[in-house]
Amino acid sequence: MVPKKLPLDLEEEILFRVPPRSLHCFRSVCKEWNALSRDKRLINKNFACAPPEFILKTRSNIYSISVNLNDDNPTINVRDLCFGDHLRGQHSLYGTCDGNFFLYDHFHEGGGCMVVDPKRVTRLLRERVLSVYKGDRFSVLEQSKKTRKIEIWVTKNKIGNGDDGDDVVWIKFMTISRPDFPMVLISHPSTNYFVENNIYGKAFVLSCPTKKPKAAWIKIDGVVFAKSDQSSVFVPSLITIP
């Protein structure tokens, strides 16, 4: 006897009641459940029923705090995430994604980004700064701490509001190799850059903090020079203003 398939709306009703931490386990049941568990509408509906939970960071620890208000006696559960030696010195917590913690390390020379996964495995990342390219695409700048070499990548196609990032293709736009180039620190809010490619060639402008007064580094068609006493920079946005 062939088993009867549940109606899609009933399957959705079952999945959205599953605790968020356990929802990913149901992705391997079948293709339909895998697609359904990734649906943004179901995810938002599922999270709306989840107990409040937030991250608390102190100088030396990071805690996960959950609040259960559904019982007669509300409870607060505090869980030490036990990073141990990963949090030596000063760190900034940028956020979490799929159980991974994104931190910025101020302790080591030059700073740096790191990702700590649920198994407490740490991976250091190269410096990266995100910007807009041609008004409808993204560009990303990454820099090596050892050589200070800069590589700039841009998305090949336009970025739409409905894109989820799975089909985005990145191509290398420009490489800058100068040992005297300043380190780009993404923790500083005034670090910005702009790239363009037109009839005059490829252009690159970087504004970043230095020990001296802030300067704009400019590269146009292979020529690099520094312009001092720069105080602001304009970077186009993907957001359309009506």
UniProtKB/Swiss-Prot annotation:
F-box domain mapped to chain residues: 1-46
Record InterPro entries: F-box-assoc_dom_typ1, F-box-assoc_interact_dom, F-box-like_dom_sf, F-box_dom
UniProt cross-references to Gene3D superfamilies, sorted A to Z: 1.20.1280.50
Stored CDD domains: F-box_AtFBW1-like
Coiled coil regions, renumbered to chain: none
Pfam families linked to this entry: F-box, FBA_1
Domain of life where this protein originates: Eukaryota
NCBIfam families referenced in this protein's UniProt entry, alphabetically: F_box_assoc_1 (TIGR01640)
Protein name per the record: Putative F-box protein At5g37040
